[in-house]
Design a protein with these regions (language model features):
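N-terminal basic, amphipathic alpha-helical segments
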Residues: 1-128, 309, 333, 337-344, ...
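Amphipathic, non-transmembrane alpha-helical secondary structure
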Residues: 8, 12, 181, 185, ...
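N-terminal small-domain helix-loop-helix segment of the aminotransferase-like
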Residues: 83-175, 182, 356, 424, ...
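Conserved core segment of the aminotransferase class I/II
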Residues: 123, 300-369
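Conserved core of the PLP fold type I
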Residues: 137-272, 284-301, 371, 461
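Hydrophobic residues in well-ordered beta-strands that form the structural core
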Residues: 196, 217, 276-278, 351, ...
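Conserved glycine-rich beta-strand-loop-beta hairpin in the small C-terminal domain of fold type I
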Residues: 369-379, 390-404
Length: 468
């Protein structure tokens, strides 16, 4: 498949999944060049292909827009997943995500923020600037562990929080998920036990399944986070090798652990010689005065692999993440060379240019303000239209709300009913291998709020009321 066909396929999937809705203006050709790292001609051919297939339309002097009735992609066949001793989550996740790919569906189930929140024009200028000075050596210079200037810029941002991490300890990856997967591979072998939260980010469950690892799900409170007593019991009973947790703005619950609990967590895992793989992709999306510290701040024995990215706070399309890997840095580099080889060189260089100015912090302040406003508006709409029996668990970060239905309602059944009205929600079953969270669902508040979203919440309230 040629590059322009690959880009066209990627955009078709974004339209089908609801990232781009009918009538939405797509990124301009120049903006798409910045996002994809492809040439202007390649992007132009991709857009022309999508236009010829009826997915988008061109408007003179205006740009490209998603067609009012974008062609629906055929449903992919459900691939059966072999049951592992601990994890079998992929089939259900695939079913739910595939069902909500229709662009006419309101994407409350989405895990992504609204792409219109990101500074595409500024990033485009950065990409154009580095393109003028890039050399043939750039690819070699940006092989693992990644661009030296970018690693230094990330290390400086750690230093702003009083955390000293050498650029040599940082490995640039293709997004946070690669950082997390490589971290798991570095400290485990197939068949090892790994602790996760219950509920947890479904990407963690998928990673465990793929690497043939066994999961221990530890009770996690919607406000207080992981139960440290239950965690210690698990550590006493099982030969645990790693613990994959989110300490800031946890997905799906939204809590942030207190500094005291983070310190206790790190000390407890160190006592049992268990590596903490800290998933910190939402750390910049806080609404309080000070940025919360990661658990890595309490790491005195090189026992925390801290993973994050720019995907949720700056630009998903660049797929740039990292892991502060400490003593595991060289092993993670070798693992990366055997899998993805390296992370996109133009994207790394563009981020170096962008981060060299004060634009990033200005963008983050604006992004946090917009997300807080959108979350408040969505929360108020949910309070207006949902029955009083529904509990809405609010938090001071990120763009998710966690909703609890009264017994005996089932969020999985509700999600299927909602889809018939072109509304998607993320039921609790997506975030756990058990049935503990069958009455819960995650709600994305990051998308621009309008009449369509208002009516969708109103319809959701009617569906719940009918089931009481």
């Amino acid at each position: 498949m040629k590059k322009y066909q690959q880009l066209a396929e990627q955009l078709r999937e974004q339209i089908a999944s609801g990232i781009w809705q009918p009538g939405d203006r797509l990124p301009s050709l120049r903006d798409q060049v910045a996002l994809s790292g492809m040439s202007f001609m390649t992007v132009s051919h991709a857009y022309q292909l999508l236009e010829s297939q009826g997915y988008i339309i061109a408007r003179p002097q205006s740009g490209y827009y998603v067609a009012p009735q974008a062609i629906k992609m055929p449903k992919a066949p459900v691939i059966p997943v072999t049951r592992d001793e601990a994890v079998d989550i992929n089939t259900y996740i695939f079913d739910m995500l595939q069902a909500s790919r229709d662009p006419s569906v309101v994407p409350f189930a989405s895990a992504f923020p609204d792409p219109r929140l990101f500074p595409l024009q500024q990033l485009n200028r950065s990409l154009a600037q580095v393109s003028k000075t890039a050399t043939a050596m750039s690819v070699i210079e940006n092989l693992p562990p990644g661009n030296a200037e970018l690693r230094q810029a990330i290390a400086r941002r750690y230093a702003l929080q009083g955390i000293t991490i050498s650029p040599d300890e940082i490995v640039i990856t293709a997004g946070a998920l690669e950082a997390l997967n490589l971290s798991l591979q570095a400290v485990t072998e197939p068949g090892d036990w790994v602790i996760v939260e219950n509920p947890c980010f479904y990407g963690a469950l998928q990673a465990l399944e793929r690497l043939r690892l066994k999961a221990l799900s530890v009770a996690t409170d919607v406000k207080e986070g992981i139960d440290l007593q239950a965690l210690e019991l698990a550590l006493q009973e099982y030969p645990v090798k790693a613990c994959w947790l989110m300490t800031n703005s946890q997905n799906p619950l939204g809590f942030t652990l207190t500094p005291q609990k983070k310190a206790q967590l790190v000390a407890l895992l160190n006592q049992y010689n268990v590596t903490l793989i800290e998933d910190d992709v939402y750390s910049e999306l806080y609404f309080v005065r000070e940025k919360p510290l990661p658990a890595k701040a309490w790491d005195r024995h090189d026992g925390v692999l801290h993973c994050s990215s720019f995907s949720k706070c700056l630009v998903p399309g660049f797929r740039i993440g990292w892991v502060a890997a400490g003593k595991h840095a060289r092993k993670i580099q070798r693992l990366q060379l055997m899998s993805t080889l390296s992370t996109s060189s133009p994207m790394q260089l563009a981020l170096v240019d962008y981060l060299s100015t004060r634009r990033y912090d200005a963008h983050l302040r604006r992004l946090r303000r917009q997300l807080a406003e959108r979350k408040q508006r969505a929360w108020q709409a949910l309070l207006r239209y949902l029955p009083a029996e529904v509990k809405i668990h609010h938090n001071d970060s990120g763009y998710f709300l966690w909703l609890e239905l009264p017994e005996p309602l089932d969020a999985g059944e509700l999600s299927l009913a909602a889809l018939t009205h072109h509304i998607s929600i993320a039921p609790g079953k997506m975030f756990s291998t058990g049935e503990n969270w069958s009455r819960f669902f995650r709600f994305n508040t990051a998308w621009q709020w309008g009449e369509r979203e208002e009516q969708a919440v109103k319809q959701l309230g009617k569906l719940i009321q009918e089931r009481l």
